[in-house]
């Protein structure tokens, strides 16, 4: 290999320092049956033109949202991304996910993060926001750890209507610290309030809620807030940022921490990533917040400047005592969210939310009119679930008509199968929705 950096002498020196005599001895823990005992037989090299054609042919095997009508839900949504978003992202000054440690050389990036934080605070109604998390699941898990640290309690309740993948991440994060995670069952598509009240006690650090929940249903968040705060625990809410164009901000119903996935804010579907997680909280929780915080200050000459602040919380300062181990964050994705929100504005976000709501309800009413039965009958935002005969057959039939819907509910809640999730955004037209209904019409 032409660019392997180690010389034979360096390899011998490294092996000697380890008390080894050969590369084979170094890798002796690898079973013989899985070792390749023949040449790798890689194809010969290609020119740049050939590589581009080869990659284009590989990419052409995949479908894209441009070639299909997308009704996919379960956490990733086909919202419109204004052209200006990607135009700004591709500027070389911004094109990195790394944290701008040198404030004197990074004022533009730091200001963009500060603007992002300001917008998320406006959306959620809370006091402080960090520079971003990896995604919605990691943001919710970090919120659980933060609640445990703040309350000095070791039990967290998570509603069974929270995205199953988010719940899985929470369980992974809390396994090491031995935090007890208890799932609260659902009833008719939202939390069973009686069971929740039974489970909340003086050892409960927080209740983790998703609103709208995984099924698209609106949770009774004000009642949940009352129950957890009566025991001096924290309310953690995972929200769809688009829904905040028309729903109450989390602060208004007493959320102490609000998190969510920012994919819908100017980030494409991209086969499930990369995303960003947003994380907002009350001001008094600032020193327990994970991730980076950008603050506004003045330099010695009185000029405005942006800096990373409260850094004593972070892993590059306190290592094992840090509030989290997040390092390189999702700054580029957060910039996309910033440009998106600045572009659509408050009125635009409200219009996007309203159109998503109205079009989802139009699709719902059309399907019910065709004889489909809803899995749940409560109020929903832009996503709902209908019962079907066979999930796989339905999704394959839709695929043949270049329609993507789902996933089937059996993937996450086998006890509710067979049923199909359908999400509708502002991008969908009446004709596209009518076509969906027409294709589904004979498969009730």
UniProtKB/Swiss-Prot annotation:
Alphabetic keyword roster: Oxidoreductase
Main function: The glycine cleavage system catalyzes the degradation of glycine. The P protein binds the alpha-amino group of glycine through its pyridoxal phosphate cofactor; CO(2) is released and the remaining methylamine moiety is then transferred to the lipoamide cofactor of the H protein.
Family affiliation: Belongs to the GcvP family. N-terminal subunit subfamily.
Pfam families: GDC-P
NCBIfam families: PRK00451.1
Molecular function via GO: glycine dehydrogenase (decarboxylating) activity
Listed GO biological process terms: glycine decarboxylation via glycine cleavage system; nucleoside metabolic process
Protein EC: 1.4.4.2
EC top class, as a word: oxidoreductase
Catalytic activity: N(6)-[(R)-lipoyl]-L-lysyl-[glycine-cleavage complex H protein] + glycine + H(+) = N(6)-[(R)-S(8)-aminomethyldihydrolipoyl]-L-lysyl-[glycine-cleavage complex H protein] + CO2
Quaternary structure note: The glycine cleavage system is composed of four proteins: P, T, L and H. In this organism, the P 'protein' is a heterodimer of two subunits.
Name of the protein in its database record: Probable glycine dehydrogenase (decarboxylating) subunit 1
Entry-linked InterPro entries: GcvPA, GDC-P_N, GDC_P, PyrdxlP-dep_Trfase, PyrdxlP-dep_Trfase_major, PyrdxlP-dep_Trfase_small
């Amino acid at each position: 290999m032409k660019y392997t950096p180690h010389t034979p002498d360096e390899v011998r020196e490294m092996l000697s320092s380890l008390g080894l005599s050969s590369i084979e001895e170094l890798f002796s823990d690898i079973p013989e049956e899985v070792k390749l005992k023949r040449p790798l037989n890689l194809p010969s090299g290609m020119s740049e033109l050939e590589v581009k054609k080869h990659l284009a042919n590989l990419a052409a095997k995949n479908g894209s949202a441009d070639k299909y009508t997308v009704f996919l839900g379960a956490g990733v949504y086909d919202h419109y991304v204004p052209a200006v978003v990607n135009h700004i992202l591709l500027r070389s000054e911004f094109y990195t996910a790394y944290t701008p440690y040198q404030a004197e050389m990074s004022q533009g990036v730091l200001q963009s993060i500060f603007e992002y934080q300001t917008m998320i605070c406006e959306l959620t109604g809370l006091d402080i926001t960090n520079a971003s998390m990896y995604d919605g699941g990691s943001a919710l898990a970090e919120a659980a750890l933060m609640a445990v640290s703040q309350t000095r309690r070791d039990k967290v309740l998570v509603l069974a209507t929270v995205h199953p993948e988010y719940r899985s991440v929470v369980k992974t994060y809390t396994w090491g610290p031995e935090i007890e995670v208890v799932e609260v069952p659902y009833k008719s598509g939202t939390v069973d309030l009686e069971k929740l009240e039974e489970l909340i006690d003086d050892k409960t650090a927080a209740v983790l809620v998703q609103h709208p929940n995984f099924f698209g249903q609106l949770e009774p968040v004000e009642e949940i807030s009352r129950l957890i705060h009566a025991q001096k625990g924290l309310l953690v809410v995972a929200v769809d940022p688009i829904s905040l164009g028309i729903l109450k901000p989390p602060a208004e119903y007493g959320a102490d921490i609000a998190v969510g996935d920012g994919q819908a804010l100017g980030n494409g579907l991209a086969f499930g990533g990369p995303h960003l997680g947003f994380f907002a909280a009350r001001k008094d929780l600032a020193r327990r917040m994970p991730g980076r915080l950008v603050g506004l200050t003045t330099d010695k000459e009185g000029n405005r400047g942006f800096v990373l602040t409260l850094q004593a919380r972070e892993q590059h300062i306190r290592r094992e005592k840090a509030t989290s181990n997040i390092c390189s964050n999702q700054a580029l994705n957060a910039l996309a969210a910033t440009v998106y929100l600045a572009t659509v504005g408050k009125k635009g976000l409200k219009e996007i939310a309203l159109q998503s709501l109205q079009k989802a309800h139009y699709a719902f009413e059309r399907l019910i009119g065709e004889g489909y039965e809803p899995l749940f009958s409560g109020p929903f935002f832009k996503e709902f679930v209908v019962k079907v005969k066979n999930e796989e057959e339905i999704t394959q039939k839709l695929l043949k008509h270049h329609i993507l819907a789902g996933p089937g509910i059996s993937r996450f809640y086998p006890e509710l199968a067979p049923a199909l999730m359908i999400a509708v955004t502002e991008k969908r037209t009446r004709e596209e929705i009518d076509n969906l209904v027409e294709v589904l019409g004979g498969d009730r």
